[in-house]
């Protein structure tokens, strides 16, 4: 019996330069490539219009504000793909997919490695663990995930580009999930429990990945790279290979001489998140002033040219004094390092976190402008996201099915906010919740 080849698309609903640096895209493509009766293609905003007469279209949702692109893509493709099922997955789906439930046929909640859930969905088998579909009569869905991270489903072949966030590099995922307790962090919740890869596996993957992709750079991927038990040994191995090492994130309290000597970073990134020690303790961001001071000493010792600090404002219990301490901490760093930048954005109360029912602080915009003004005179550059974009992120993160009618005709964050404001619904999604929202039906 001859099996019919099925055409399957994986779409990253944004530009190529963002999608090519997304490990999930490579994981999905590699995972589906093992099925011989599937013809799999990867697409981005620039080329999705080539998709015609496909059987299944998977869209990975990494960021809430990509929903606008995703909805447009679905509307465009349904015309030329009348028999296709549209499937969503990714961190946003684990967080809360209900605002976009109307637009997709199926949601896969969780991590697909070690399972055949994608193949089952392609074959129209929806009544399986980890799958939510409007064609099924069930209101709850339980996340699926591999108990251990192995090399079996890891994408050694990864098409690369200088345009990507990491340039031409091999993406090496050290671990998934985070052992820290930060109360605001979505990743801690949706990727629990934290799992790290074996050192031998990482060495093998690095060697093969560099050889197969003909690159001389390895980007280390994990919520907190420095928390990996064998990080120094791994970096020594990569250094001996003669490749450049690019860590995605390092905590101030995990830095040491050995790590700095190997990494030789030109820019050191530190995320205190809050300016005062009191507020950091409250959000369980366990970084002390002495940890930051030690990181700055190491930066000076190893010739770091620039330090970038990441902060949030609008944190519950925050006071004017906390804002002043944020400013003073940044000034202290500037006295030690010539070039200092900070990124400051409002805290988004995310589903499944300790702050999921808290209100979004609309006064954050004024706080950010105040910080910018105070630091500009010190020669410190202050970066921040578009405020409407952050408001929209909160709305979409905590929204319900009623948002779909607004998303149906809203082309961007500003138009969605305007529509909700007109119908006096902004406070429903930005204000304090009395209880958990619809995301309580997603069991992590």
Curated annotation (Swiss-Prot):
Segments forming domain Radical SAM core: 164-381
Alphabetic keyword roster: 4Fe-4S, Iron, Iron-sulfur, Metal-binding, S-adenosyl-L-methionine
Cofactor: [4Fe-4S] cluster
GO molecular function: 4 iron, 4 sulfur cluster binding; catalytic activity; metal ion binding
Top-level taxonomic group: Archaea
Keyword Magnesium: no
InterPro entries per record: Elp3/MiaA/NifB-like_rSAM (IPR006638), Radical_SAM_N2 (IPR045784), rSAM (IPR007197), rSAM_horseshoe (IPR023404)
Metal-binding among keywords: yes
Sequence positions that bind [4Fe-4S] cluster: 178, 182, 185
Cofactor binding annotation: Binds 1 [4Fe-4S] cluster. The cluster is coordinated with 3 cysteines and an exchangeable S-adenosyl-L-methionine.
Protein name stated in the entry: Uncharacterized protein MJ0966
């Amino acid at each position: 019996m001859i099996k019919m080849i099925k055409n399957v698309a994986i779409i990253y609903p944004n530009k190529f330069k963002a999608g090519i640096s997304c490990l999930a895209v490579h994981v999905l493509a590699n995972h589906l490539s093992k099925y011989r009766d599937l013809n799999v293609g990867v697409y981005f905003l620039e080329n999705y219009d080539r998709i015609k007469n496909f059987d299944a279209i998977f869209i990975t949702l990494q960021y809430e504000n990509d929903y606008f692109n995703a909805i447009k893509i679905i509307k465009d493709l349904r015309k030329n793909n009348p028999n296709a099922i549209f499937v969503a997955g990714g961190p946003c789906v684990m967080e809360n997919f209900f605002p976009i439930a109307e637009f997709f046929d199926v949601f896969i909640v969780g991590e697909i490695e070690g399972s055949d859930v994608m193949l089952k969905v392609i074959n129209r088998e929806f009544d399986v663990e980890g799958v939510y579909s409007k064609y099924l009569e069930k209101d709850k869905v339980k996340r699926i995930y591999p108990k251990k991270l192995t090399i079996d489903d890891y994408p050694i072949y990864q098409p690369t580009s200088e345009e990507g966030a990491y340039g031409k590099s091999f993406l090496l995922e050290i671990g998934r999930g985070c052992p820290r307790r930060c109360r605001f962090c979505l990743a801690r919740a949706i990727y629990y429990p934290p799992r790290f890869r074996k050192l031998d596996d990482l060495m093998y993957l690095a060697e093969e990945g560099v050889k197969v992709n003909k690159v001389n750079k390895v980007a280390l991927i994990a919520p907190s790279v420095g928390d990996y038990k064998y990080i120094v040994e791994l970096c020594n191995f990569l250094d001996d290979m003669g490749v450049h090492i690019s860590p995605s994130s390092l905590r101030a309290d995990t830095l040491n001489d050995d790590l700095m000597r190997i990494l030789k970073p030109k820019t050191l990134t530190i995320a205190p998140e809050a300016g005062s020690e009191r507020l950091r303790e409250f959000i369980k961001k366990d970084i002390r002033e002495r940890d930051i001071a030690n990181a700055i000493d190491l930066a000076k010792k190893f010739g770091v040219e620039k330090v970038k600090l990441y902060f949030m404002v609008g944190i519950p219990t925050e006071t004017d004094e906390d804002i002043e301490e944020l400013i003073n901490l940044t000034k202290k760093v500037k006295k030690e390092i010539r070039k200092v930048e900070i990124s400051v954005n409002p805290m988004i109360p995310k589903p499944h976190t300790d702050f999921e029912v808290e209100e979004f602080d609309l006064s954050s915009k004024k706080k950010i402008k105040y910080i910018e003004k105070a630091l500009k005179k010190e020669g410190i550059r202050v970066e921040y996201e578009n405020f409407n974009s952050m408001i929209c992120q909160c709305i979409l993160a905590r929204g319900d099915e009623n948002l779909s009618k607004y998303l149906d005709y809203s082309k961007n964050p500003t138009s969605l906010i305007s529509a909700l404001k007109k119908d006096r619904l902004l406070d429903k999604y930005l204000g304090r919740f009395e209880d958990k929202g619809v995301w309580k039906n997603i069991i992590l």
